[in-house]
Amino acid sequence: MDTSLFSLFVPILVFVFIALFKKSKKPKYVKAPAPSGAWPIIGHLHLLGGKEQLLYRTLGKMADHYGPAMSLQLGSNEAFVVSSFEVAKDCFTVNDKALASRPMTAAAKHMGYNFAVFGFAPYSAFWREMRKIATIELLSNRRLQMLKHVRVSEITMGVKDLYSLWFKNGGTKPVMVDLKSWLEDMTLNMIVRMVAGKRYFGGGGSVSSEDTEEAMQCKKAIAKFFHLIGIFTVSDAFPTLSFFDLQGHEKEMKQTGSELDVILERWIENHRQQRKFSGTKENDSDFIDVMMSLAEQGKLSHLQYDANTSIKSTCLALILGGSDTSASTLTWAISLLLNNKEMLKKAQDEIDIHVGRDRNVEDSDIENLVYLQAIIKETLRLYPAGPLLGPREAMEDCTVAGYYVPCGTRLIVNVWKIQRDPKVYMEPNEFRPERFITGEAKEFDVRGQNFELMPFGSGRRSCPGSSLAMQVLHLGLARFLHSFDVKTVMDMPVDMSENPGLTIPKATPLEVLISPRIKEELFV
């Protein structure tokens, strides 16, 4: 080979080799963009605001700037934040199993029987078994049909209690009630009857003073649970600091967990005594009876936790999932209607057309109440019970929307932001139930198959109680709107302020004036 040609060829080969080597040394995986301003050690924690910060709104604003998928450094933890339905679909389909675990937080440890409450439990054989039992024995269509009388009777008694209050106050003019508190009592009654076979509130003196005291303790403890699980705890970002409990939150969590445990232990002991002296009635069994039968058959003995813990933790999961969330959604629905009076009238007119005023609304009427169904969907869109769903954790490395998500990363899905996407919804921040009848969202369902609308989540970690929730929401709202005329004092608009937490609780009471709009005998 000519010397001059060889001297030219060698540098070219060296250049190509160096270029290929550098290319091979480039990062194999690309991570989602991260907001600027991260600090050493704490990462992005300071950007998420204080304890009164509405995290889903803060993350929504970040997504407007950094895109639908972004990375956050939360102390020693890495998080992957999702803010679009396209990225969420990738999480809950292709990567659903890889992202199916839960982070081991202080709240789940201290208030959830050391991660035994299946809604907060890491992915495991125990989680699968407890979710399966809860789904089949309480939340399946067959079981819900068997327990229909509980749901219907509690709504009926709740409506009757409101009528009695109006009647006792003279029965001639509207009476003021705190609907938020009434809805909380009604939904707690319902789920406690299904789980433990007892009721707490109302019923014209049918509840003992002892049960009333326990009810207030339970209601207070549940409220504390949802508050504590939704606030920032230092040890979740820096596990090595758990011992110091710098904020005092872990002490509060332990106390709240203990308060709930006392109540649950009392329920189980009462059932033991009843079974000892009266035996069981299979068709009328509540969930504790079902769980105790499984324990007696040895079907809980092979699990990670002892039978008593398995029963208490699963009952707690059902109580938490079935009370506060339904009450909150109904509170927002009525608040939205009071601020949109023409829609309130339209909903009541629809009920009058299909039901009339000579009988009460029944489950079988709901399929004809199309506008009422749309109201519930629109409420769940604007105020999803879990605005960030439950945090997930990657069990293995995976790729989401082209971005690398390493094992151990926490997944945060901002459903609140996804369900206000202007590319999907016209006037996304406005209350427009019609969008689910003739508008852009008429084909959307809430069961997790349409990622543009998934208030109950999607995939393996979706809420197993969505069917029960929808039944409660539909019949509860229908019976209230059918039974009462409702307005605010001096027709003032309802304060729509939100409180921070795992859910979206209304910050202020919902004090309204009610009066009957159907005949008296329908309340008896």
From Swiss-Prot:
Disruption phenotype: Increased root length at seedling stage. Accumulation of fraxetin, but loss of sideretin root secretion in response to iron deficiency. Slightly increased iron-uptake ability at elevated pH leading to a better fitness of plants, due to the presence of high fraxetin content. Heme binds at residue 463. PROSITE patterns: CYTOCHROME_P450. The chain crosses the membrane at residues 1-21. One of its GO terms (cellular component) is membrane. GO terms for molecular function: fraxetin 5-hydroxylase activity; heme binding; iron ion binding; monooxygenase activity. The keyword NAD does not apply. Its cofactor is heme. Pfam families: p450. The keyword Hydrolase does not apply. Expressed in both primary and lateral roots under iron-deficient conditions, except in apical root zones, and mostly in the root epidermal layer. Its EC number is 1.14.14.-, 1.14.14.164. Pathway: Phenylpropanoid metabolism. It is a single-pass membrane protein. Induction: By iron deficiency, mainly in roots. It is an enzyme of class 1 (oxidoreductase). It catalyses: fraxetin + reduced [NADPH--hemoprotein reductase] + O2 = sideretin (reduced form) + oxidized [NADPH--hemoprotein reductase] + H2O + H(+); xanthotoxin + reduced [NADPH--hemoprotein reductase] + O2 = 5-hydroxyxanthotoxin + oxidized [NADPH--hemoprotein reductase] + H2O + 2 H(+). It is found in: Membrane. It comes from the Eukaryota. GO terms for biological process: cellular response to iron ion; response to iron ion; sideretin biosynthesis. Can hydroxylate xanthotoxin (8-methoxypsoralen) to form 5-hydroxyxanthotoxin (5-hydroxy-8-methoxypsoralen) in vivo and in vitro. Involved in the early iron deficiency response, possibly through an IDE1-like mediated pathway. Involved in the pathway of sideretin biosynthesis from feruloyl CoA, a redox-active catecholic metabolite exuded by roots in response to iron deficiency in order to facilitate the uptake of iron; this pathway consists in the successive conversion from feruloyl CoA to scopoletin, from scopoletin to fraxetin and from fraxetin to sideretin. Belongs to the cytochrome P450 family. Plants overexpressing CYP82C4, can hydroxylate and subsequently glycosylate 8-methoxypsoralen. This is Xanthotoxin 5-hydroxylase CYP82C4.
